[in-house]
Swiss-Prot record:
Keyword RNA-binding: no
Protein name, per record: Thymidylate synthase
Pathway membership, UniProt: Pyrimidine metabolism; dTTP biosynthesis
Encoding gene, per UniProt annotation: thyA
Residues holding (6R)-5,10-methylene-5,6,7,8-tetrahydrofolate: 183, 282
Length: 283
């Protein structure tokens, strides 16, 4: 929690204003931030200086694992996070690749689970990683990525948290996640949860101990209409002790995650938090 608040304070004090063409808003921006989540010690990075809807963040992660490309599927899992980008993004609404209401196109897990190959066909990146790790293999390229510039025109949004690189060392599984852009008050709040949970799940289904998740953020920003709430409200609050995340031990395979796992299989214990803050969301 401290490292997140330190980043927020750094942006407020040292950030530079940048015009964002997609949203038409200014962003107070810094370049490069590195966050670490110790899954081995159970240090769940859940924001306590405002109420965080952790269930929706995990629901979104499950959708990425399953390769969903429709906002309705994400809603069924328990999150409305893709409703706006699927149905209110002006550029996407006029895109000939859009299939209709709730269609997100080729984004995130829909790319990673069906990564296009040169010359035709596709690769299921996550399946390859899980199969390798279950056999104790780390080929130094166990990367689940959603980043495919050749397919950007076929989706409603370029991926922000775009790559997850798993590494196995002496029986312990580590994760290096890379994020090109982070809406720090809103998106990063969820992304931290997702990096932690993804490593915990992958370690559990491949039979390894979980180590640390290392989270690299390139462009970290606060939108101009979020700044006052961050500076004058959230950063004035004293954080509570970090809670813990409990995952159903019966989750033992990728097939489990693809089929029967729901939010009921996750529980957060000891979560104390300050009142919620309604930060504006930019489409």
């Amino acid at each position: 929690m401290k490292q997140y608040l330190d980043l927020c304070q750094r942006i407020v004090e040292q950030g530079k204003w940048v015009e964002n063409e997609r949203t038409g808003k200014r962003c107070l921006t810094v370049i490069n931030a590195d966050l670490t989540y110790d899954v081995a010690k159970g240090e769940f990075p859940l924001v306590t200086t405002r109420k965080s809807f952790w269930k929706a963040a995990i629901a979104e992660l499950l959708g990425y694992i399953r390769g969903y490309d429709n906002a309705a599927d994400f809603r069924q899992l328990g999150t409305k996070s893709w409703d706006a980008n699927a149905n209110e993004n002006a550029a996407w609404l006029t895109n000939p690749h859009r299939k209709g209401e709730d269609d997100m196109g080729l984004v995130y897990g829909a790319v990673g689970r069906n990564f296009p190959k040169v010359g035709g066909g596709s690769v299921d990146l996550l399946r390859q990683i899980v199969d390798d790790l279950k056999r104790g293999v780390d080929n130094r390229g166990e990367i689940y990525t959603f980043y495919h510039p050749g397919a950007f025109h076929m989706g409603c949004l370029r991926p922000c948290l775009h790559s997850h690189h798993f590494s196995l060392l002496d029986g312990t599984l580590y994760l290096n996640s890379t994020q090109r852009s982070a809406d720090v008050p809103l998106g990063l709040n969820w992304n931290m949860i997702q990096c932690y949970t993804f490593l915990a799940l992958m370690a559990q289904i491949t039979g390894h101990q979980a180590g640390q998740a290392f989270h690299k953020i390139v462009n970290a920003h606060i939108y101009e209409d979020q700044l006052e709430l961050m500076r004058d409200v959230q950063l004035k609050r004293t954080p509570f002790k970090a809670p813990t995340l409990k995952i159903n031990p019966d989750i033992k395979s990728l097939e489990d995650l693809e089929t029967w796992v729901t939010l009921a299989d996750f529980e957060v214990e000891g979560y104390e938090y300050h009142p919620s803050i309604q930060y504006p969301f930019s489409v």
